[in-house]
Design a protein with these regions (language model features):
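Conserved serine/cysteine hydrolase catalytic core
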Residues: 148-220
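Active-site loop/oxyanion-hole signature of alpha/beta-hydrolase fold enzymes
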Residues: 35-71
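Gly/Ala-rich beta-loop-alpha elbow adjacent to hydrolase catalytic centers
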Residues: 74-78, 82
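Flexible "cap/lid" loop of the alpha/beta hydrolase fold
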Residues: 87-122
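Catalytic active-site module of serine/aspartate enzymes centered on a nucleophile-bearing elbow/loop
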Residues: 205-255
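Short beta-strand immediately N-terminal to the catalytic nucleophile in serine-hydrolase-like folds
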Residues: 72-74, 97
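Conserved alpha/beta-hydrolase catalytic His-Asp/Glu region
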Residues: 125-161
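Conserved HGGG/HGGXW glycine-rich cap/lid loop of the alpha/beta-hydrolase fold
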Residues: 1-48
Length: 255
């Protein structure tokens, strides 16, 4: 994984989802107080392309980057990778944003329906632009799809098209629940399937839960998210999360 680091202070590792590393623009102000460590997952530019991208292999690669005491934040597919890596990592905190670990809530009707809509995309012979439009519409992302796709975006979409389906991931609940660091699970109040996954993660990991509406699946861009994240990080650093769960800030589920 190619890694960019900016800022100073405790390390906050930010792992992007499908679609590539956009550089986390809304979180850049945190570089005044944290060292932002932003890996680009293998297979995504500027890394060389791969024929197949696997979350288990990427969890191993992420583990090589992590250092004791890191804060780890994973969005979407990067959230699945982060959950796998965190099970054996010495972290200060873990936050995941709508990880598509749909296997943990496969009994939920909305999850089963969403997986049935996504399954035809892996594999597919759709051209990259049509693939991206269909994916964005299906998962509820607020991403604007340009036409034609710029070369760097097309390269990221081609990487996305060879990712292993994230609902195949086996989340190590026991190890994560036993880990001493606090956990935060965030959803975007836009799709019952992601709500269901996040609800299971909250319960099984004894995690703090937050809902940040306003940007669909593109939670890093949601109004108020960066402030909510920093509040969690601040309490994690001070050790104030031993008993606090702050679930009262969660509005009703969308389904």
């Amino acid at each position: 994984m190619q890694v960019e680091a900016v800022g100073s202070g405790p390390r906050l590792v930010l792992l992007h989802g499908s679609g590539g590393n956009s550089g986390w623009p809304a979180q850049r102000p945190l570089a005044e107080r944290y060292t932002l460590v932003m890996p680009t997952r293998t297979g995504y530019p500027p890394n060389p392309p791969l024929e197949r991208i696997d979350f288990e292999r990427q969890a191993e690669e992420l583990h090589e980057i992590l250092e004791p005491g890191d804060h780890l934040l994973g969005h979407s597919y990067g959230g699945v990778v982060s959950l796998l890596a965190a099970a054996s990592a010495d972290l200060r905190s873990l936050a995941v944003l709508e990880p598509p670990a749909f296997g943990v809530a496969g009994h939920h009707r909305a999850v089963a329906e969403l997986v049935s809509e996504l399954r035809p995309l892996w594999p597919t012979d759709l051209p990259p632009e049509r693939f991206l439009r269909r994916f964005v519409e299906t998962v509820g992302s607020e991403m604007s799809v340009p036409s034609p796709l710029p070369p760097e975006v097309e390269a990221s979409v081609r990487a996305m098209m060879v990712e292993r389906a994230p609902w195949e991931a086996q989340i190590p609940f026991d190890e994560l629940a036993a880990a001493p660091f606090p956990k935060l699970v965030v959803s975007g109040a836009h799709h019952a399937a992601f709500d269901a996954v996040c609800d299971v993660l909250e319960q099984r990991l004894d995690a703090e839960r937050a809902v940040v509406p306003g940007a669909g699946h593109s939670i890093p861009r949601a109004p108020g998210f960066t402030e909510r994240l920093e509040e969690f990080l601040r309490r994690a650093r001070s050790g104030a999360l031993a008993d606090a769960r702050h679930r009262a800030d969660r509005p009703p589920s969308t389904g």
